[in-house]
Amino acid sequence: LFDDFVFNFAANRKLQMSRINFPLPVYHNDKLKKKIEKKHWRMEHFFMRQDYYTLIFDNRRQMNLVKDTTIDHVIVEKVFYRKKVVQQFLFNRINGLWMMTSINYKPMYQNMNASFLKFYGAFATDTAFQARHLHNPVKFTGPDPDDDFSTMTGDIEPETWPAFAPQLPHGMIYNIIYGQKYTESSQKIFVIRGIANGLETQLTFKRIGGKWLLMKLEM
């Protein structure tokens, strides 16, 4: 699985150096800017210095791609909000081995998730904005506080939202494209996936009448 590879790649310098196609082409807006020689490469830790990473999907079906062993092209994205730039690391499976083959920088507004990324940037950092973009009610599925082995489902009214609101990553977020073909769809599933603890939070957003709303929170 690509996930198994990328965790090792981000943690193991020797493996990383052996799995990059040096000199590594770096593109800005699809134009070749430079090539990085092996001796100038700085170890890329991706999300290993934090205990989670984030993913964006259009629908549930796309989420199954993570477990698909036949995929041979994956893009790891770093979305930088202040610079409004997306840095893409391209990986291809060559002769059975995952290799990083290029880096590409693109403006955030050119991303297939542009509308959602712009919305999420405000949703994650502005509580007043967040409150205005909640569906009434927000569907909730999460652990039952009275029973460790079962989940509870219910509705969150806007006034009780602050008690449920999860900590949302902001400033810079990750996304991994396992071959999911994004469209400017009216639904996005934003996933915060724990690296070591197996915890996962899913937020389902829908665009209704041009406005993104949080429909569902699953923890």
Language-model features, listed with the residues they occupy:
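Short, well-ordered alpha-helical segments enriched in acidic and aromatic residues
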Residues: D4-F5, A11, L15-H40, F129-D146
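Short beta-strand edge/turn micro-motifs at domain boundaries
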Residues: Y81-N111, G198-M219
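Surface-exposed beta-loop interaction hotspot
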Residues: N95-R132, P137-M152
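Extracytoplasmic/secreted envelope proteins and their assembly/folding machinery
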Residues: D3-V6, Y120
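Surface-exposed, charged secondary-structure patches
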Residues: V26, K33-K83, D144, S150-L199
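A structural feature that tracks compact, well-ordered secondary-structure segments
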Residues: P23-P25, F89-L90, F119, L203
